[in-house]
Regions:
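Long, highly charged, low-complexity intrinsically disordered interaction regions
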Residues: 105-127
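Conserved short S/T/G-enriched processing/targeting/catalytic segments and their helical context
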Residues: 3-111, 135-170, 180-194, 199-240
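A mid-sequence, solvent-exposed acidic-amphipathic segment
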Residues: 119-145
Length: 240
């Protein structure tokens, strides 16, 4: 059947948000993956295949999986080469890989492939966005995927360098629930008894970690209350 046939109708990754905050870098994603026939599944969309490097992608699920294997394969093949991956050169080398990968696979697809990469090195941690041209851009905040515009509405104008990761997660959590409720066509969402995928890269920690359960519960309560406030305002507006 060939590679491009197998990529024809896989689920689409929907929204990924990243921010560099006062206490570290945080990545937040929904877990819903919607196929073109309307069916959907739930899974994590943030991966750390390499030490101190966390990635989130948008595009097709199978493209996403192939790219992960492509990066790891690149790492193995070039381990003795002058062009091998190191922690210091990871971003520019990964950018070249994204560009090559786009030419090999993504040019044949109708959904663009973008990457958010967080490099964890204490206070010097970096957040980068790699676009479809393979250009790496250092950023304080970025949302990618079908939910980008709505995420920007809720999270884009925050003073990221002066807020905590947990506060950013509260806003991102609210944005995900908002999209799930009011804009289902975006394909953004989580299961009723679950939380978004949340990874902390803290300034005072050596390793990244999943957000603690207590943080997730607190952020969920914030998001639900914000939705209630929005519903009440909308109801009052309609009454007028």
């Amino acid at each position: 059947m060939g590679l491009y046939y197998c990529l024809r109708e896989p689920p689409i990754l929907t929204v990924i948000m990243g921010a560099k905050c006062v206490d570290g870098i945080v990545l937040v994603t929904d877990k819903k993956m919607t196929a073109e026939d309307g069916t959907f599944t739930y899974c994590d969309k943030i991966f750390g295949d390499l030490s101190h490097i966390i990635m989130g992608y948008t595009g097709w699920e199978r493209t996403f999986d192939i790219f992960r294997k492509y990066i790891v394969g690149d790492l193995v093949i070039n381990r003795d080469s002058k062009d091998r991956y190191t922690f210091s050169n990871y971003i520019p080398v990964a950018s070249k890989s994204v560009k090559r990968f786009d030419k090999l696979v993504v040019d044949k697809c109708k959904h663009k492939f973008e990457v958010l990469i967080a490099k964890h090195q204490y206070e010097k941690s970096e957040l980068h966005y790699i676009n479809v041209d393979g250009t790496a851009i250092p950023i304080p905040y970025k949302a990618i995927g079908s939910g980008q515009n709505t995420a920007d509405m809720h999270c884009g104008k925050l003073d990221h360098k002066n807020i905590t990761m947990k506060y950013f997660v509260k806003r991102a959590y609210y944005s995900i629930l908002y999209m799930d409720k009011f804009y289902p066509d975006l394909g953004v969402g989580i299961e009723d008894d679950d939380h978004p995928c949340i990874r902390y890269l803290e300034n005072d920690k050596d390793l990244d970690r999943e957000a603690p359960k207590d943080d997730k519960i607190e952020c969920r309560e914030y998001a639900i209350n914000k939705l209630k406030e929005w519903n009440e305002k909308e109801s009052d507006f309609l009454k007028d």
